[in-house]
C-alpha cells in the first residue's frame, strides 16, 4: 500500500514537472542525468509555484495541509512559491452524517437523541481534519444551549502516519541530493508538520486552547470566544457554545448592518497585539473563515474567534526580541537590530555584527520611502527572516508562526480600512510592554512572582550548599587521593620546619635573656 502511494507521488511529480524544478539544484550527477531524460519533450506554461500547488492538491488533504504549513516558512521559501502555497484551501467533501453520529455516540457513550435536541444531520462546515454539526443540548446544566459539535474524521491516524512516513523519506532524500537541502531543512519542516498535525487531531487540546483564550479576554469588550462544554469534550468530539456572526470577509454586509468598519479594523490589531505582548498566547489561524463579527445587540460589532487548533506561544524572551526589533527598526537603528540577533543566540558567534547590520540596512531602508501607515510589520519580519538565511540564523518556529499570523491580521485590517495605520495602533503596546518589563513596575511584578520561591529556598540554602560540596567531595575524592596525600606530606614537612624554627626562636630568645642577666650580674649593672 505504501509502495503504491509512493508511485502516485512519483507520477504526480512527473505530471506537474516538479522534477524540472529540482533539476538545476540536484547535487548528484546521475540523478541529474535521469531527471534530464524525464523532462525531454515536456513544456510547462504555469509558473513553478502554481504547479507545486496543483500537485499538492491532487495528492489529497494531508499534502494540502503540508503545503499550508510550508507556506508559513517564508524564511525558507522564495516569495512567489510561498504566496502560491498560501492559496491552498481545505476543500474536502463532508463524510457521511450517519458515521458522524456513530462517532459522537461512541465517544460520548450515549445516543445522540439522548444528548441533543435538533442534531442537524447536514454539517455546517467540513475540512480535512473534522466537520461541524449544529445541535441543542437536551439535559443537564447546559440544557437548551445551542452548540456546535465538532467531529474528527474517522480513520485519520493511519492515513496521516502513512503519508508522514513517506514525507520523512522524501525529506531525507531531498537533504542528501538537493543543493538547498541542508539550508531548507526538510526533515525539520516535516517534524514540525508532524507535531502540528497530531496537535490538530486532539480536540481536547483545541478545547483547552479555546478555554485559555476565552479566559484571557474575559472582561475585555473586544473578543468573543465560545465556552467549551467539558462534559461533552473528548479527543475526537468537541462541543462548544454556538456563536452566530457574519464572516469578516463580508464587509458590505457588515457596513449595511451599521458596523463601524474603521473601528473594527483597529480593534482587530488591538486584539492581536494584546494576545502577543500581554498574554504571549495567540490565535495563529486568523484567516477570514475563522473570524466573524457579532450582530447580536448585546455584543454588536465584536469579533468572534473560532477554531483553536493552531495556537502560538511566546516566552518573555521572544516578546522582548520582537518589541526591541520593531522599536529599533522604526528608529532606523540597524546596528541595534543586528545586535539583537546576535544576543538572541540564534546567530553563529563568528558572525560579524557590521556585516549583519549592512544586510539589515539593505532590507529595511527602502521601507522608509513610504508613509508609516503603509509599512507592513509582517513584511518587515519576513524580509528580516529571509536575510537571516544568509547568516545561518536559526529562526524559531514560534516567531515564523507569529509572522504568518501578523500578515493575516494586517491583510484583514487593511481589507476593512485601507487607511489603517498599523504602526500607530501597535506602538503603544510595544512601548507599554517595554516599560512594564524594564521599569520599576516590571521589577516589582517579577519580585512578586519570585519571592515565594526565594522564601522557600533561602532557609534551605546552607544545607543545599553543604550537600552540594559534600557530593562534590565524594565525587572527586578518588581522583584526588594522590594529590591529597602529597599535600598532607608537604604539610607535615612544613609543620616540622615551623616547629624547628619556633624552637630555635625560643632558644635564641631564652639565650639572649640569660645573657643579659649574666652580664648584669658580672658587671654590677
UniProtKB/Swiss-Prot annotation:
Positions annotated as active site in the UniProt record: 285 (proton acceptor)
Cellular component aspect of the GO annotation: plasma membrane
Protein keywords: ATP-binding, Cell inner membrane, Cell membrane, Kinase, Membrane, Nucleotide-binding, Transferase, Transmembrane, Transmembrane helix, Ubiquinone biosynthesis
Keyword Cell membrane found: yes
Region forming the signal peptide: none
Annotated binding of ATP, by residue: 124-132, 150
UniProt subcellular location: Cell inner membrane
InterPro entries per the UniProt record, alphabetical: ABC1_dom, Kinase-like_dom_sf, UbiB, UbiB_bact, UbiB_kinase
Similarity section: Belongs to the ABC1 family. UbiB subfamily.
NCBIfam families (alphabetical): PRK04750.1, UbiB
Official protein name in the record: Probable protein kinase UbiB
Organism from which the protein derives: Paraburkholderia xenovorans (strain LB400)
Gene: ubiB
Amino acid at each position: 500500500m505504501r509502495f503504491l502511494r509512493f508511485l502516485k507521488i512519483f507520477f504526480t511529480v512527473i505530471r506537474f514537472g516538479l522534477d524540472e524544478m529540482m533539476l538545476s539544484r540536484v547535487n548528484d550527477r546521475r540523478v541529474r542525468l535521469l531527471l534530464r531524460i524525464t523532462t525531454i519533450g515536456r513544456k510547462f506554461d504555469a509558473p513553478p509555484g502554481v504547479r507545486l500547488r496543483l500537485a499538492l492538491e491532487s495528492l489529497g488533504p494531508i499534502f494540502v495541509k503540508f503545503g499550508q504549513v510550508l507556506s508559513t516558512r517564508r524564511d525558507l521559501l522564495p516569495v512567489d512559491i510561498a504566496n502560491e502555497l498560501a492559496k491552498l484551501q481545505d476543500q474536502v467533501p463532508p463524510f457521511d452524517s450517519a458515521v458522524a453520529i456513530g462517532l459522537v455516540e461512541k465517544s460520548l457513550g450515549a445516543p445522540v437523541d439522548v444528548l441533543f435536541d435538533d442534531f442537524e444531520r447536514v454539517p455546517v462546515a467540513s475540512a480535512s481534519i473534522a466537520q461541524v454539526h449544529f445541535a441543542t443540548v437536551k439535559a443537564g446544566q447546559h440544557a437548551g444551549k445551542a452548540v456546535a459539535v465538532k467531529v474528527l474524521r474517522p480513520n485519520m491516524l493511519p492515513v496521516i502516519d502513512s503519508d508522514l512516513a513517506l514525507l520523512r523519506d522524501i525529506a531525507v532524500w531531498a537533504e542528501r541530493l538537493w543543493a538547498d537541502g541542508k539550508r531548507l531543512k526538510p526533515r525539520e519542516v516535516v517534524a514540525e508538520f508532524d507535531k502540528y498535525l497530531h496537535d490538530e487531531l486532539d480536540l481536547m487540546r483545541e478545547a483547552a486552547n479555546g478555554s485559555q483564550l476565552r479566559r484571557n479576554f474575559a472582561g475585555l469588550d473586544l473578543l468573543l470566544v465560545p465556552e467549551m462544554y467539558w462534559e461533552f469534550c473528548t479527543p475526537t468530539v468537541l462541543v462548544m457554545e454556538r456563536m452566530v456572526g457574519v464572516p469578516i470577509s463580508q464587509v458590505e454586509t457588515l457596513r449595511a448592518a451599521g458596523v463601524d468598519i474603521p473601528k473594527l479594523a483597529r480593534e482587530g490589531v488591538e486584539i492581536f497585539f494584546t494576545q502577543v505582548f500581554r498574554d504571549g498566547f495567540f490565535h495563529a489561524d486568523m484567516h477570514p473563515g475563522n473570524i466573524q463579527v457579532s450582530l447580536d445587540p448585546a455584543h454588536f460589532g465584536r469579533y468572534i474567534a473560532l477554531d483553536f487548533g493552531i495556537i502560538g506561544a511566546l516566552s518573555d524572551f521572544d516578546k522582548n526580541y520582537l518589541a526591541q526589533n520593531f522599536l529599533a527598526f522604526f528608529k532606523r537603528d540597524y546596528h541595534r537590530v543586528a545586535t539583537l540577533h546576535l544576543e538572541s543566540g540564534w546567530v553563529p558567534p563568528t558572525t560579524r555584527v557590521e556585516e549583519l547590520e549592512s544586510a539589515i540596512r539593505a532590507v529595511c531602508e527602502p521601507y522608509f520611502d513610504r508613509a508609516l501607515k503603509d509599512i507592513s510589520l509582517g513584511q518587515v519580519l519576513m524580509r528580516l527572516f529571509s536575510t537571516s538565511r544568509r547568516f545561518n540564523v536559526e529562526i524559531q518556529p514560534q516567531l515564523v508562526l507569529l509572522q504568518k499570523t501578523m500578515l493575516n491580521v494586517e491583510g484583514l485590517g487593511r481589507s476593512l480600512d485601507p487607511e489603517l495605520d498599523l504602526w500607530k495602533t501597535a506602538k503603544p503596546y510595544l512601548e507599554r510592554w517595554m516599560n512594564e518589563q524594564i521599569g520599576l513596575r516590571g521589577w516589582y511584578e517579577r519580585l512578586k512572582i519570585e519571592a515565594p520561591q526565594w522564601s522557600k529556598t533561602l532557609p534551605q540554602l546552607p544545607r543545599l550548599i553543604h550537600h552540594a560540596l559534600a557530593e562534590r567531595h565524594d565525587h572527586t575524592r578518588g581522583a584526588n587521593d594522590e594529590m591529597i596525600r602529597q599535600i598532607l606530606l608537604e604539610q607535615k614537612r612544613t609543620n616540622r620546619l615551623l616547629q624547628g624554627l619556633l624552637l630555635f626562636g625560643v632558644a635564641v630568645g631564652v639565650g639572649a635573656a640569660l645573657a643579659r642577666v649574666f652580664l648584669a650580674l658580672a658587671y654590677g649593672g
